[in-house]
Design a protein with these regions (language model features):
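Short, conserved clusters of charged catalytic residues that mark active-site
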Residues: 85, 108-112, 153-156, 177
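Short beta-strand scaffold segments in enzyme catalytic cores
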Residues: 2-11, 131-132
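Generic structural signal for helix capping and beta-alpha/helix-loop junctions
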Residues: 83-84, 110, 204, 225
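Proteins enriched for Cys/Gly/acidic motifs involved in redox and nucleic-acid/cofactor modification
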Residues: 23-24, 90, 104-132
Length: 235
């Protein structure tokens, strides 16, 4: 999940940090390391958008690190819905005499980590369904001659969405008819992994998806192979 931490003492920010990458130091540890005078940590206030973890994973429990420093309080937006945390970090802090204030900017926190919460609560990925249609409910002309329904601003929004998601999925007919690249062009950010459902291997050999350098995963019923960053998965 995306987590940030700000440490405040006497009305001033003394440290801040965020979780930069999976398996890396958590936001709380990075914020603590950012504090120049560690003596100021005692009696301070920790502002965190997600409950500090309470278990040993790729890193030690953040709740234990906080307890050692004896802050006055910890203010959080959301409880961590991961079953191995799920309130245990909050309980551990309170059992060690640290005040915990919950649900500050709760809705904002839920929005920031909506992908994480969706997965933890349902076991399913967070999915955005995207299409463009005319006011009277049509997607394209029957002969396929139509082009853009969306405008420049809406297309820019789509590229923003692409930069925020790890993957984008289409069917083989869309790939062959529209010949999309499915990369990020009208926005700054990383390209998503492109995924095509092609059960009978009908994907055109000259499609942009096969000719560029981006990662492509093609799910089909016949072949299992890998050609550089083009992965064909039999399923």
């Amino acid at each position: 999940p995306m987590v940030g931490c700000v440490i405040v003492k006497s009305g001033k920010i003394i440290g801040e940090g965020y979780h930069k990458r999976y398996g890396g130091k958590h936001a709380e540890v990075n914020a603590i390391n950012n504090v120049k005078d560690k003596s100021e940590l005692k009696g301070s206030s920790f502002y965190i958008n997600l409950e500090p973890c309470s278990h040993h994973g790729k890193t030690p429990p953040c709740s234990d690190e906080i307890i050692k420093l004896k802050p006055k309080e910890v203010i959080i937006s959301n409880q961590d819905q991961n079953p191995i945390v799920n309130g245990r970090g909050i309980k551990k802090l309170r059992n060690n005499g640290i005040s915990v204030i919950e649900n500050i900017k709760k809705k904002k926190g839920l929005d920031v980590n909506k992908r994480f919460f969706k997965n933890q609560l349902t076991g399913l990925p967070y999915i955005i369904l995207k299409w463009a249609e005319t006011e009277d409910g049509f997607l394209a002309k029957e002969d396929g001659s139509s082009k853009w329904i969306s405008n420049e601003l809406s297309r820019m929004l789509v590229h923003k969405w692409r930069s925020e998601e790890p993957g984008i999925l289409i069917g083989v007919n869309t790939a062959n008819i529209d010949n999309p690249s499915l990369n990020v062009r009208s926005w700054k950010g990383n390209n998503p992994i492109r995924i095509v459902l092609d059960p009978n291997q009908k994907l055109n050999n000259n499609t942009n998806l096969l000719s560029d350098k981006g990662t492509l995963m093609v799910y089909n019923k016949k072949a299992e192979k890998k050609l550089n960053n083009k992965i064909f998965i039999k399923n």
